[in-house]
Design a protein with these regions (language model features):
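Solvent-exposed, non-transmembrane regions of membrane-associated and secreted proteins
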Residues: 59-168, 178-182, 190-252
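N-terminal membrane-targeting segments
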Residues: 2-80
Length: 252
């Protein structure tokens, strides 16, 4: 396992459609960085310990810790990784923003690619913890193929853009606004969690025969000994309809 300069935790290199893909996840041991995944809870844990030593109200600190656990996907939310039937698709247009009403997310979208060593870039924790990023070597949202958007779950400042991603359920909607003014409307088909050493990169990043969307963040248990999450949460969604600028919703 390796780390990027941004503190990304890297897995086994893979090649997908000629692209060398090294799965990366935000890590908590890079320097210098005032923000990192899970570190907010780690800092609260330190505060809790200090309160305990002082004989103070430890229950308050424990309550704060409990409140900062990101929602995890339930077995009922696993659903499917794709739709039952092929749906509509859109022409290529770069994504501008993403909205997820069920979990209160609105974010402008960064466009990120790969680093010099071929690993997938992640948003900067120091500057962009509250912004999601579209992987620019994936399909644009609404195109036939898999479009990938990633975001951090938390940082030193607390919950980040995809903190509540694991709370999504099949049927929830995801709206991606495109540069041409069209909004691509996706419906969640499933939410799954994978141990990072078993992350199915081919399933997530390889081409699909329908307009697919994948949202990715860290999830599962936070390992305080190593300073990173043990799993990744992945939301699978498919395009169901779209709206034009000022126009009605359409399904094709």
């Amino acid at each position: 396992m390796r780390k990027t300069a941004e503190g990304a935790h890297l897995g086994t290199p893979r090649r997908i459609a000629g692209l060398r893909v090294v799965m990366s996840w935000p890590d908590s041991e890079f320097t210098p960085a005032p923000a990192r995944p899970g570190a907010f809870r780690a800092r609260l844990a330190a505060v809790a310990g200090a309160v305990l030593l002082a004989g103070g109200a430890i229950t308050i600190a424990v309550a704060l810790l409990a409140q900062q656990h990101a929602p995890q996907p339930s077995a009922a939310a696993a659903g499917a990784t794709g739709p039952a039937a092929k749906g509509p698709s859109l022409h290529r247009s770069l994504p501008v923003s993403v909205d997820i009403p069920a979990i209160g997310v609105h974010s402008q979208l960064l466009h990120l690619g790969v680093t010099a060593d071929g690993s997938i870039q992640v948003p900067s924790l120091t500057r962009s913890a509250d912004e999601a990023a579209w992987f620019k070597y994936s399909a644009t949202p609404g195109q036939i193929g898999a479009s990938v958007i990633e975001g951090h779950v938390d940082s030193y400042q607390g919950p980040a853009v995809f903190f509540r991603l694991g709370a999504l359920r099949p049927g929830d909607t995801i709206d991606v606004t495109l540069a041409d003014g069209v909004t691509a409307i996706f419906r969640v088909t499933g939410v799954r969690q994978y141990l990072k050493e078993k992350f199915p990169a081919k399933t997530i990043y390889s081409a699909a025969d329908y307009a697919a969307l994948r949202l990715i963040t860290c999830g599962g248990t936070f390992d305080y000994a190593t300073g990173h999450y043990l799993s990744s949460t992945v939301v699978f969604a498919s395009l169901t309809s779209s709206r034009g600028p000022g126009g009605p919703e359409k399904s094709s």
